[in-house]
Amino acid sequence: MSRLVYVGLIVLIAFLLYPLYVLFLVAFVPPKYTVDRLYPYQYPAAITLENLEGALSNPQIVHAALRSLTVATLVGLLSVALGIPTAYGLSKLPERLAYAITTILFFANMMPAIVVAIPIASAFARLGLFDTVIGLALAQELVALPVSSFVLLGVFQSIPKELELQARVDGAGLFRTLFQIVLPLAKEGIAATFLLSWMLSWDEFTFAVLLSPVNPTMPVLIYLYTTRGNLLEAAAMSLVLTAPVLVLTILLQKYLKGEYIGGGLKG
């Protein structure tokens, strides 16, 4: 690549990382250096853990973090549990038909989330699921399931069909073939699916603010603190919200292979 391309990449990376740098300033630098006077090219004048310690010792913030963690983990597990049979069934269909059905599954993600969230909130209020962990997880699964099915479809399509055929010839039934042959080979893709779904839930906002207003998750609480002018606590919470995503992004590079994504696009 030419020097101009390298310069362009450096500028792009700096542009993308600058918001994280400002977040670092507000979260770790004493307030007198940030809230009162924050400059675009400012260097950290001092480092303090006071803001982060204050956020982590706040019971409301701890409760929101635990709620986000619980909901995200539940969404990840549901995505795997529902995505495996969905994607495995799709992998047995002709590729064009599987692609068409996958596109239909993504239709829910194409609509504005608030269009779906309002009728769900009304239904959950009647079912006793409003402002509950399970209710919020089920709603967020509408977003996560198409993604998990898409990734797992690519995973199953990347497994050689000869292995399944040989197992069937040896007398293995459908479920035995799935659990003893297919799933062990797909474990990395399943792990990637769980992580992707977990991340989708971890920072999801629209369903959380409409379906869990009394017991908010981290994104909702950050919004509330920001609108009330509590920027230091909001910055510390944003840092807590961002850190797992950065770690999981690195892990996804290990588990998510190119053929998994490519497989879901065949047809």
What are these regions (language model features)?
Residues 1, 24, 71-105, 178:
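Transmembrane-helix boundary motif in ABC transporter permease subunits
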Residues 41-42, 49, 98-99, 103, ...:
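Membrane-interfacial helix termini and adjacent extracytoplasmic/periplasmic loops
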Residues 66, 70, 96-99, 165-192:
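Amphipathic cytosolic juxtamembrane alpha-helices at the membrane-cytosol interface
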